[in-house]
Structure formats: structure tokens, C-alpha cells
Curated annotation (Swiss-Prot):
Keyword flag rRNA-binding: no
Gene3D superfamilies: N-(1-d-carboxylethyl)-l-norvaline Dehydrogenase, domain 2, NAD(P)-binding Rossmann-like Domain
EC category name: oxidoreductase
Binding site for sn-glycerol 3-phosphate: K101, G132, S134, K188, D241, S251, R252, N253
Protein name: Glycerol-3-phosphate dehydrogenase [NAD(P)+]
Native organism: Onion yellows phytoplasma (strain OY-M)
Residues annotated as catalytic: K188
Gene Ontology terms describing biological process: carbohydrate metabolic process; glycerol-3-phosphate biosynthetic process; glycerol-3-phosphate catabolic process; glycerophospholipid metabolic process; phospholipid biosynthetic process
This protein's pathway: Membrane lipid metabolism; glycerophospholipid metabolism
Family named by the database record: Belongs to the NAD-dependent glycerol-3-phosphate dehydrogenase family.
InterPro entries attached to this UniProt entry: 6-PGluconate_DH-like_C_sf (IPR008927), 6PGD_dom2 (IPR013328), G3P_DH_NAD-dep (IPR006168), G3P_DH_NAD-dep_C (IPR006109), G3P_DH_NAD-dep_N (IPR011128), NAD(P)-bd_dom_sf (IPR036291)
Keyword field: Cytoplasm, Lipid biosynthesis, Lipid metabolism, NAD, NADP, Nucleotide-binding, Oxidoreductase, Phospholipid biosynthesis, Phospholipid metabolism
Record-linked SUPFAM superfamilies: 6-phosphogluconate dehydrogenase C-terminal domain-like (SSF48179), NAD(P)-binding Rossmann-fold domains (SSF51735)
Length: 329
């Protein structure tokens, strides 16, 4: 099967390997000419690893015309602009699979909602998300990984499950809760920030366990608000992705939290990072959402104060500890 991947960063290029391992034909698109050149030379553009039987182009129209299945692997801040470009170029219906994590600031929309808003209905065949605990650094080495394909169309979820599952190292489950999967995958980045701060400040495992437990509760509040299934919080895109993002040395968001603890501002982190750190934009979006709808999300509030307002950790921590006594649930 022919498949187009939009965005040849760490994850997009790694998924190209997954698909070619399953004997599919993959064409990557990127505006980064250096990435395109490396891929066409048989090299992964980010990691020191081969990437064979994959081609790349810098022409979006050529990439879109290549296949009827489009994988979206671009940072959230570029998603709407990219989709507007795609909408202008489509002449036949396409199916989309999103692998980017986050929600859009100001609108609070998920990727599936942006796609439906921008791509004309006659040209949108199907949509699914592919999420879960999946550091590209491990998948490129073909280490065991589990993901979830979520779609409101069960048949399409099954199609994506079969397409991306590799018997030796990658297994995909299906879900009908597209909403929950998208929200969980976005929210876990916020908890990774805070865990990075806790570790950098030598807090113990007790505090990290407390953060994860109360954080999962806030995750379920958001999933319920968006009318998703709270059970999804316990799945791969929820608890699974949270563990990977909040505790791994590969996690950009965890490492960003450690830098925040060292006194580096979020803008300095963004300016010095070679790869996108989605959590900053996601945190801002969730903070504005909870203000607008009066949601009780104390970890979101504390995270925003630490990262965007540069409040002292001791002050923010004291505020959290002084919240009124209450039942756990």
C-alpha cells in the first residue's frame, strides 16, 4: 500500500520504517531540505540509523498525490496552516491518521476537530489517531512498543491497526474513543514538566507518585469535559504515555521541566531546542480552558504559574499544599 507521511522529524521518519517493515511504500514530505536529502540517501534525518526503501520530497502536492492515506506528523502550532494548504490541493478524498499530540490554543480544538473544520467533507474519507507510549528512539531500534488506533469508524481503526502492527516489535490496539485518546495524549506532557521539576529538586518518589495519581484525576476531568470515555485514561495513550513521558530520559517535556527547575525560562528552552516541545503550547491551552469553563485543575494552574509566570517553586508548592482538605474523589 502507498502511504504519505507529512513531517519527517523523529516520529514521522520512524513510522516510515514501521510501514516499510510491513512492505508498504512510503513517501515522506518535509520543507526541511536537509531532512529530505538525508532520507533519500537512506539515512534517518534525526537518529544515527538507516532508513531504507523510503523516499522524501519537498513538494506538498506531489506528496498528496502519491497516496490516499495521509499521516500527519507535524507540530500542533503548524497543523491548521498545513491543513489549509492541503485542503486547497486535494482533488480526491483522502484518509488521515494523526500522530501529533496537543490541542490548539485559543480554540481548544483537537486535531480531529481541526481536520473536520478545514478539510471539506467530500474530501475527508476517514480519520484516526495513532497514540501511545512510543519514544521514536526505541521504535527506530525495533524495541517492543504498543499503540492505540482510535477512530469513530471502527472499520478504519481496524485498517490502521493492521497497517502499523509489526509482529516482531509493534502491536496496535483499537479504540472508538477518539476524543479521550487525543486529550490524554496532550495532557500527559504537562505532568512530565512537573515531574522533571520534582526530580531536579530532589523530591522523593512519594511526591512523584502523588503527582501521577492526582494528575490522572485531572486528566479524567478533561476527558469527561470533552465528552470522552474516562476509562481511556487507563489506556496506552493515557497512563501508558504518561509513564513514558514523565519518567524517561528521552522525554523532551521531562527534560524541559528539569531546565525550568534550574532557572531557565520556557522561551530560552524553546529557542535552544532542535525539536518541538509540544507541552508548552498544550499547557497554555489547558490553562485558558480551565479559566474559561471554571474547571478545578490545580496541577494545570501550578504548572502555568511555574512555567509562564516564573513564580518561585516554593510559593507554588505552598499554595498547593494549603488547598482545603477534601475527600480524595
Amino acid at each position: 500500500m502507498k502511504i504519505t507521511i507529512i513531517g519527517s522529524g523523529a516520529w514521522g521518519s520512524t513510522l516510515a520504517q514501521v510501514l516499510t517493515d510491513n512492505n508498504n511504500q512510503v513517501l515522506l514530505y518535509d520543507i526541511n531540505l536537509s531532512y529530505v536529502e538525508k532520507i533519500n540517501q537512506g539515512k534517518h534525518p534525526i537518529f544515527n540509523a538507516p532508513l531504507v526503501n523510503v523516499k522524501a520530497v519537498s513538494c506538498l502536492k506531489q506528496a498528496l498525490d502519491y497516496s490516499d492515506l495521509i499521516v500527519l506528523s507535524v507540530p500542533m502550532k503548524f497543523m491548521r496552516h498545513l491543513l489549509k494548504q492541503i485542503a486547497l490541493m486535494l482533488t480526491t478524498p483522502k484518509s488521515f491518521v494523526n500522530v501529533s499530540k496537543g490541542i490548539e490554543p485559543l480554540t481548544f480544538l483537537r486535531v480531529s476537530e481541526i481536520v473536520k473544520q478545514v478539510i471539506p467533507a467530500p474530501l475527508l474519507a476517514n480519520f484516526a489517531s495513532l497514540m501511545g507510549p512510543s519514544h521514536a528512539e526505541e521504535v527506530i531500534l525495533r524495541k517492543l512498543t504498543l499503540l492505540t488506533a482510535a477512530s469513530s469508524n471502527p472499520a478504519f481503526a481496524l485498517e490502521i491497526q493492521k497497517l502499523f502492527s509489526c509482529p516482531n516489535y509493534l502491536k496496535v490496539y483499537t479504540s472508538s474513543d477518539l476524543v479521550g485518546n487525543e486529550i490524554c495524549s496532550a495532557f500527559k506532557n504537562v505532568l512530565a514538566f512537573i515531574n522533571g521539576i520534582l526530580v531536579a529538586k530532589n523530591f522523593g518518589i512519594n511526591s512523584q507518585a502523588a503527582l501521577m495519581s492526582r494528575g490522572i484525576l485531572e486528566m479524567s476531568v478533561l476527558v469527561t469535559f470533552y465528552q470522552g470515555n474516562p476509562q481511556t485514561v487507563l489506556g496506552l495513550p493515557g497512563l501508558g504515555d504518561l509513564i513514558v513521558t514523565a519518567f524517561s530520559k528521552y522525554s523532551r517535556n521531562f527534560n524541559a521541566g528539569a531546565k525550568i527547575a534550574a532557572g531557565i525560562t520556557y522561551q530560552q528552552i524553546i529557542d535552544s531546542s532542535l525539536q518541538t516541545i509540544e507541552g508548552f503550547q498544550t499547557l497554555n491551552a489547558f490553562y485558558q480552558l480551565q479559566l474559561k469553563h471554571n474547571l478545578d485543575l490545580p496541577i494545570i494552574q501550578a504548572s502555568y504559574q511555574l512555567i509562564f509566570e516564573s513564580k518561585p517553586f516554593e510559593t507554588v508548592f505552598a499554595t498547593l499544599m494549603q488547598r482545603p482538605f477534601k475527600s480524595e474523589f
